[in-house]
């Protein structure tokens, strides 16, 4: 792993959060806090997990470091190398693909000028291909940071990226106005009866 810092320690605020997370688990089961602690370490370290951060988490939990590495390398939510300010994760799993994720991938490639696994020269965007993000009913979709952008087409995907490029904050959720995961055409079965009840 290149570009690794020599040390890692949680800052004071995150050290308190780490203690609170560990305290949620019964004595003898503190290792169960490994995933939230890795997330906390990643957030403190600009979106990626250096080896020293994983070693620090292992020390806090009394785990062999290899067990922490196994978790960090298994889940795609952990980044083992530096990423851009905006991590664009495009779902290409079957439901998104059937609903047009190829067009979303193409729009992202065109707008950002990069491909999967790459970061823009200015360090603003990293683009990743990801497996299912769990919002299949609103496919196709992508995740940027902690936000989901759903019911995408190439135009809406491009608009989201352009807004981020200009420093704006695009509205997460459905890009077609759909309410949560209702059918695309609106409610069909659970409609209010006449009289509003």
PLM region spans:
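Signature of N-terminal electron-transfer/Fe-S-associated modules in redox systems
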Residues: 1-197
């Amino acid at each position: 792993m290149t570009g690794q810092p020599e040390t890692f320690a949680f800052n004071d605020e995150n050290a308190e959060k780490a203690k609170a997370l560990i305290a949620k688990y019964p004595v003898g089961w503190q290792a169960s806090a490994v995933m939230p602690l890795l997330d906390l370490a990643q957030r403190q370290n600009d979106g990626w997990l250096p080896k020293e951060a994983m070693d620090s988490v292992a020390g806090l939990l009394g785990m062999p470091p290899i067990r922490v590495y196994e978790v960090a390398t298994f889940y795609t939510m952990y980044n083992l190398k530096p990423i851009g300010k905006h991590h664009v994760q495009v779902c290409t799993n079957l439901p998104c693909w059937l609903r047009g994720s190829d067009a979303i991938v193409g729009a992202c490639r065109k707008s950002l000028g990069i491909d999967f696994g790459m970061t823009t020269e200015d360090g603003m965007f990293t683009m990743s291909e990801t497996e299912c993000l769990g919002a299949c009913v609103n496919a196709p979709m992508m995740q940027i940071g902690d936000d989901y952008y759903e019911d995408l087409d190439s135009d809406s995907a491009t608009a989201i990226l352009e807004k981020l490029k200009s420093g704006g904050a695009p509205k997460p959720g459905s890009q077609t106005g759909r309410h949560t995961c209702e059918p695309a055409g609106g409610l069909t079965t659970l409609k209010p009866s006449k009289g509003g009840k």
